Amino acid sequence: MGYKHIKHMKKCSALWACAAALAVLVAGCDKEKKPVEEAVTVPGDAVNLNAAGETANSYIVAPGKTSVFSAQFRGNSKTEAVGAAVSAELLWQDAASLIKDVYYVPETGQVVVSTGKASGNALVAVRDAGDNILWSWHLWVSDYDPAASLWSSPAATGGTVWKFMDRNLGASSADADDWNSKGLIYQWGRKDPFKGAVSFTVQNEDYSYSVTGEPVLYDIDNRAVKATAFENAEGFGAYEKSLQNPTVFYKILKDGDGVNIPKSKDWRDSSDDDAWGGVSLSKSVNDPCPPGYKVPVCAANGDHPYEWHDYSKATWDATNYGMVQDGQWWPACGTRVNYSGGLDFPQANPYSGMWVGTAGKASSDLEANPALYGRYTFVSNGKRLYNKYDQKDSRSQGLSVRCVAE
């Protein structure tokens, strides 16, 4: 039936007859007793996350509240339907009891979520009658109000100014001494997040890791789950498959023998240079940022959103491992490695990359430029050689994102 939250179930032969007669189950068969089954509705006190008329792939959700958002369309699209959803579920949460409840309301096509008092991140999804995931959303559980602390970048060469959030996407703090200021990890062009390292990693001589930095994630019952799986990104319709498998990190393209195929370092078999709006210059359906914000991209005149990033003007915080420039904190976060999906965050050389939604090389020119890249800026100790704001990395790499106002 697609309905959830059956409460106060009684043994009564007339139950289903009553249910059918009422269409939506609102009462039991014994009028003097409590209702046998509740209707699946949106609570009257629920915070509408689409109140401004925008939808997105992530939402900032207040702790200790009940919130509701539309699950009818993909991302910020008004036309690309999610499909025939019948249920919603929590895929993972990075803090126990972060999410208290989540359910789908078929009548309105909305997801209702209730949060605990903690801050953190969660991933929820809707499924169809065949139990297939149709779409998923990142819930950024925090009291954070981005508009209250936006930072305007220095004007680029062509005069473009970007208004940045004061923290990475998914960070529950902007404080340098808080590990939770690091936020989440994304493959270039994907909407779904992965958790970053919760400790520095230690690599062995054979390139295995004795300390992996992998986080503990939880299901709705606070049981530990392995929420990140890894698959080779072979040519099997990876984009649509990624939508059905939002917790799978698609590694660098390989053939059946495990040998790297040199023609592409993308995670998907059909590359899309506009996956994050780098061509259209508009927020894309795959953009991971909440309503009103998007992944920064290069401007039409070629201005780079991190052109202001200058090691000579920045200070490296050797205690908290990050860069401070113009009062903004840019933490080193490490990466998820493109060829394995494992975390890399060495204490001796801590670093991170901030994705830009502009392609490094056009996918249409694959033969001439066989490696497909996304552009990013490098965060590391200024004494290192990586001192330019415009870098390129394979699209299957997992890096950080800092959203800008649309």
Q: Which residues does each predicted region cover?
A:
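Short, compositionally biased
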Residues: V42-K283, G360, S394-E406
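Bacterial Sec-dependent N-terminal signal peptides
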Residues: G2-H5, K10-K11, A19, A23-V47
